[in-house]
A protein has these predicted regions:
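Hydrophobic/aromatic residues within transmembrane alpha-helices
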Residues: 27, 36, 40, 88, ...
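C-terminal transmembrane-helix exit sites in multi-pass transporters
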Residues: 105-130, 255-274
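Hydrophobic transmembrane alpha-helices of multi-pass small-molecule transport proteins
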Residues: 121-142, 260, 272-291
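Structural signature of hydrophobic alpha-helical transmembrane segments
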Residues: 31-46, 87-106, 149-163, 212-227, ...
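Specific transmembrane alpha-helical segments of multi-pass solute transporters/efflux pumps
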Residues: 16, 20, 49-101, 107, ...
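Helix-helix packing/entry segments at the starts of transmembrane helices
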Residues: 39, 97-103, 168-192, 223-263
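Membrane-interface interhelical linkers
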Residues: 1-12, 45-72, 90, 118-126, ...
Length: 346
């Protein structure tokens, strides 16, 4: 990620998803959490359906794989994930919610190991999982930034788990629908599920609610900027720089959320919050140590070297390099590289 356009796109995405947590915090002052999440995806679904129509994309599911993808994305990635996320954030600060959801790339490898037959987990990833979970413990213990609000952390962890399971299951589907069409379906199905869950919960009744202007602005901002704009920026970034570099946005988002929560909402950032986040970042680095080293190493003069091939090498000051179409051999991560670690959550 060296071009100015890629960096600006990365920053725009981090800001869109990072500020989402503050917008959720504002909206929760006037709206019950599950209803708020449902309304957010009402707005986003309308925008995505309009995009499908405007672009003339195929929207009708053609195969069983399409229907499976719609069900997985709608039920897990949108419905269950955001229900748990919004309920969890009603107990904790926006910064803590953002930090807990940054566990998604760390929890993906062990879940993928159970579901994807060719997926392999190496020892550093196991250590990374333990370190990342230790970060959650640091944040959640009484006397930390949550003041013992373990219920909120529990809901947030549930949101992370259903998102990871949904992402891995989606990886297994063979689908023909364009990504924008799939997103439109997922948001519409997810919104319907959220409305259903809200209707079944007595505390979620919208009868007699007074929607403050700030909550209305937060709702529109979440639907338009954070969801529609965020997904657009994410998939553009994914196409330009790949899944590994795009997934780093998960660790810029909590920084944005913490700064905005402190500046706009007066939230406190404690040493426990900072320490827990540092452990989660360290856990991510261990989970992705091969891929990160492959990309960062050459920039500092170290890192993996590609194996020489007879007749196709070039010697520069004693170092032999291969043609650009050669692979990294043992450093190729194979199946794991195709799993997208973007949360889209925020």
């Amino acid at each position: 990620m060296t071009s100015k356009r890629d960096i600006l796109l990365f920053l725009a995405l981090a800001i869109a998803w990072g500020t989402a947590f503050s917008a959720i915090e504002i909206g929760l002052e006037s709206l019950p959490p599950i209803l708020f999440a449902a309304l957010r995806f009402d707005v986003a679904a309308v925008l995505f359906v309009a995009a499908v129509v405007a672009l003339g994309l195929e929207w009708r599911p053609q195969t069983s794989g399409d229907w499976t993808a719609i069900a997985v994305a709608g039920v897990l990635l949108v419905g269950a994930h955001f229900a748990f996320l919004f309920v969890g954030q009603s107990y904790v600060s926006s910064a803590v919610a953002a930090i807990v959801t940054s566990l998604i790339p760390i929890l993906t490898p062990p879940i993928a190991l159970l579901v994807l037959p060719r997926y392999r987990v190496r020892a550093p990833a196991v250590v990374g999982l333990a370190v990342g979970l230790a970060g959650i413990v640091v944040i959640a213990v009484p006397g930390g930034s949550l003041d013992g609000h373990l219920v909120g952390v529990g809901f947030l962890l549930a949101s992370v788990l259903v998102f990871v399971v949904g992402s891995v299951l989606l990886e297994r589907t063979v689908r023909t629908l364009p990504m924008v069409s799939l997103q439109a379906w997922a948001m519409a199905v997810g919104a319907a599920i959220l409305h259903g869950a809200s209707a079944l919960h007595p505390a979620e009744s919208g009868v007699g609610l007074t929607l403050a202007p700030s909550a209305l602005v937060a709702l529109v901002y979440l639907g338009v900027v954070c969801t529609a704009g965020g997904f657009l920026a994410y998939f553009l970034l994914l196409e330009r720089v790949g899944a590994t570099e795009a997934s780093l946005v998960n660790y810029a988002v909590p920084v944005v959320a913490a700064v905005v929560g402190w500046a706009a909402l007066g939230e406190t950032i404690t040493l426990a919050t900072i320490g827990g986040f540092a452990l989660i970042v360290a856990g991510f680095a261990l989970c992705k140590i091969d891929v990160l080293w492959r990309q960062v190493g050459p920039l500092v003069g170290y890192g993996p070297r590609r194996r020489p091939a007879a007749g196709r090498g070039v010697v520069v000051d004693g170092n032999q390099y291969l043609a650009d179409d050669d692979t990294y051999g043992e450093y190729d991560t194979g199946e794991s590289e195709r799993i997208t670690h973007g949360t889209g959550a925020d």
